[in-house]
Amino acid sequence: MFGNLFEEDYSSVSSSQYGRGKKLKTKGLEPPAPREFTNLSGIRNQGGTCYLSSLLQTLHFTPEFREALFSLGPEELGSLEDKDKPDAKVRIIPLQLQRLFAQLLLLDQEAASTIDLTDSFGWTNDEEMRQHDVQELNRILFSALETSLVGTSGHDLIHRLYHGTIVNQIVCKECKNISERQEDFLDLTVAVKNVSGLEDELCNMYVEEEIFDYDNLYHCGTCDRLVKAAKSAKLRKLPPFLTISLLRFNFDFVKCERYKDTSCYTFPLRINLKPFCEQSELDDMEYMYDLFSVIIHKGGCYGGHYHVYIKDVDHLGNWQCQEEISDTNVNVKAPQSEEEANDPLVVLKTILLQEEANQIPVDQLGQKLLKKTGISWNKKYRKQHGPLRKFLQLHPQIFLLSTDESTVSLLRNHLTQAPSDLQSCEQILHTLASESPGLNDDTSCPHWFDINDSKVHPIREKDITQQFQGKESAYMLFYRKATLQRPPEARANPRYRVPCHLLKEMDAANILLQMRRAECDSANSTFELHLHLGPHYRFFNGALHPAVSETESVWDLTFDKRKTLGDLRQSIFQLLECWEGDMVLSVAKRVPAGLHVYHTLDGDDLTLCEAEVADGEDIFVWNGVEVGGVQIQTGFDCEPLLLNILHLELSGEGSKCEQLVESPHVFPANAEVGAVFTALGTPAGAILMNSVESADGECWTAVPKEDMKKTFREQGLRNGSLILVQDSDSDNNSLLPKQGRWTNSMNELNWLQVKNFCQSESEEKQVQIAVTMHTVVFDIRIKAIKELKLMKELAENSCLRPIDRNGKLLCPVPDSSTLEEAEVKMGSSVGLCLGKAPTSSQLFLFFALGTDIHPGAEMDIIVEETLSVRDCLKIMLEKSGQQGEIWHLRKMDWCYEAGEPLCEEDATLKELMIRSGDTLLLTEGKLPPPGHLKMPIWWYQPARLSGHCESRDHLNCAFSQDSTWRAAPTQGAPGPEPAEVSLLYLGDMEISEEATLVELKSQALALPSVSKLAVQSTALLRVWTVESKRPSRLLRTNWRQLKEYRLGRRAELCLELLQKEEDLGPRDVLLRTQLRIPGERAYSLATDLIWDTTRGWTAGSLRQRVADFYSLPVEKIEIAKYFPEKFEWLPISSWNQQVAKRKKKKNQDTLQGGPYYLKDGDTIGIKNLLFDDNDDFSTIRDDIGKENQKRLALEKKKSREVHRAQSSDLFSNAGVPARFRGPEASLSIHVASFR
């Protein structure tokens, strides 16, 4: 069971470091959840496809449509395997619809996916993320199906089932001539405005006549003149399935805006269409139609949600409605059958006897019980007999569990049963099934379900009346002819008329799902426990601590949480072969003072889940009494608290000067506060408390003498709290900080400022609420709403959001938390905003477009923490109005800079440690495949650098006329005139991280812009990384792989063209040197200098190399490094190095470290002391640059102040501009031609 867990070397028990954080378990893709008790499958929402799900479920629960589609075989529709072949005519939409219906019927999953179907629609621009009208989809989908089925036996499927005919007639009052026009309809559109119900509107449309008279006469063709006439319409041909679309959306011409009509509009469960038909000689039943589907829209005209009420005609689902059961429907059975039905042993034996090989997984046994009897184990037996697995374990004489307890079977002596026994078993199951509410086939109680995307719930037929009116009301009605009867073999048979190839595919998929669920369940059932071995611990300083080392004291054990505490105890006994005496397992916890034991794990028959043992739990293994001879107190009450105590001590021996000393002390939480005097050896005095770690600016509270007997916990102290102890003869105020204040009550109230951000017309803009650190956020919010005189409705749709010092609204705080838990400081400001705070499973995220943003420009969104990065990106793109697929997400760091991209697009936000309040950046550009880099390539031409092959003017001729230099100012590069770092964008390049530097150069030379330069060799190119729009790091060693440079996913490179080949060694440093012009504050052209640092990075070595290069005496030159971002020069001399030597170690005598940080590409100024002995290295441009920096800093300061003021007054005006709504996207389905 445990593999090599118990071998002597204990290789499976890690000696991990004690006190580390919990590991993040990387979860694989979990299989979809099985169907719930209704045994019906929903459809997963792709982001905005609730309208599609509702219509597809309606078609699926139209058996005649479903079976007609199933009747079309691969010989007519083709095969999905051939869809990518150029000459194959594969009708993808009907094939995907067949597969979806088969999955909804047979695949054991909570919800099916429509991704394959929407892909067959040709949706490639995130159409599934947009909301559309279901009535429009109904017409477009049927049109697409008709086009897809051209040339097959199902070419008239839609026309045969859904098309009807309306005839419009005009009768001349003079000659009685009838002029008529016939038109087909797919659905009847009926008005809602000013109409009470469906039957009234049908009367208006197909019973009442419109009279042409007076000023509105009709021109009769027979009479050839204007005459009186009557116009009417009738239903000439009725389809088997009648679709009715309610026109709830209208346009207000006064306000010039759309609105939804939410007035009451009734419709019958059965309707007689005979009064509205042209022919009425048929039997009345031919005109009767029964309602079987109602698509419901919740929301307004600019957005909302669809779900559907559906009648299960074939009784495919498990429908339960306890209120419909009459008291007379009581099963009178033999007393023996009732007693046996109540015996779980008999029931479970019966189920196992009906299984193949009389064996079944334990997890599926409960599902079988629910399916066959209609009642779950927990509901009928758990209270008396305990959990199912435990019940099986307690009856080993009947049930045989596998070694891993995953499957169960009957023992051999229980397998042989007489026919009478088998018949009795069937009767028992029938008895239970008949007792189960809702499983009796009562035809008088139709089976209706509410299908809301993935979720399916049974409803009563009378619940339909609730959808007559309101924001959530009926939008489409579907009726079927009452004469349509279903064959008996279709009843409760989901396999009826499903093609054989789809049956095989679904059976194989179900087997695979079972295997995946078993594997996932096994993987999810193991967790890690940290075993703290009692003999390796000692008790001192108020808590438990490792006696030798944490490695020997703490072991990690991976264990199955479905096993019992007895199994865990036995496993630990086997691990610790030398253990003597009793073994007690207790839950422990790491606290600041050390390790503390809380409670003992009792009940060896309880599983770890039932004992509430969590993943990563710390388990203390000991004898339950003492550790190292010291008796241990356990429990929450005596939890050790680490307190910081301030008290006066003499500053030294014989000194009378006292100083305030802070020292940590550990006390049990249930100890009296007066124990502080004992710990300090002080007989008596005064105690002042501060609940935070710093005394600066906080409130000190004096403990009255009568409260000295109270415990630390009763006084509200916690880990890190400060206690100030004063002798009884000292001045009470002498030790208090200047900002502190003396308070005599523990319950003194502080204030919290609440600002109104609800865009209301309330006169009050902000209020102060009296609070303590233990006040609940919900109470503060409700009180603020009352004092701001806002509407009571805001209590259900508002939240509190802290405001930072820049006026930005932060993440909403949960209603259930206290101010202390929410980390809201006293005296701070919070905003009362519209919208609910995120739940514990949701994240509140900020996001913004691009990478160059400033605080306050972000949008916000609330998403589930289990959402994948890909889905989160789609939602953010939709909300920001962006289109396309070339986007990715980056997490912004604390200084508002774009961080690394979120590459694992299938990982959840929770797995990537995304937290509420984080800011994500929508960055344009597609992420490269794993193991590849995608980076911009620039052409770099240093300004006026001597020794280079071409000038910039010449290079401009080589590039196209459309290419322009992007000049990034160097902020004062040295020279007689303004200089700039010039970068020309060449294009993006994607390359493998396994490629070498020389391969990168070769691939860069293939870029169209570079090929015009006709560079003869890769050795004539230097490659630099680009940071802050300037070259940063020089890449050398041609045969080194790119991954060794650790470029990162945000790397940018630039190429520099050389006049001659060079091969820099690992110790060569490239410097730009400039000789200062005597008598002027300027420098000559820059020249490249290669410095070999083999002898060290010393100032003397660099000075010697410069002197040799310029043929000058080394004692007659002075050199300095230029810092362009500061417009400053720092002289490099051996004297500076000597100062550094005295302050630091000798091995730090290097120019690589501070204050020079010398690297490739740095500018070195050189001064010839024979002609210029002035100490100044600066230029006129440096003076100008410094002035500009001062001016920019002042402007930024003013800008921040203005922005802060604007943020605080953001909602001060009552008028809020109308929300901009983008153009609505059209809905379309792309179908190939099959004519």
From Swiss-Prot:
Active site positions, chain numbering: 50 (nucleophile), 305 (proton acceptor)
An example molecular function term from Gene Ontology annotations: cysteine-type deubiquitinase activity
Catalyses which reaction(s): Thiol-dependent hydrolysis of ester, thioester, amide, peptide and isopeptide bonds formed by the C-terminal Gly of ubiquitin (a 76-residue protein attached to proteins as an intracellular targeting signal)
EC class: hydrolase
Domain USP intervals: 41-482
SUPFAM superfamilies listed in its UniProt record: Cysteine proteinases
Family matches, as Gene3D superfamilies: Cysteine proteinases (3.90.70.10)
Keywords in alphabetical order: Hydrolase, Protease, Thiol protease, Ubl conjugation pathway
Enzyme Commission number(s) from the entry: 3.4.19.12
Annotated GO biological process: protein deubiquitination; proteolysis
Family designation: Belongs to the peptidase C19 family.
Protein name (record): Ubiquitin carboxyl-terminal hydrolase 40
Organism, as annotated: Mus musculus (Mouse)
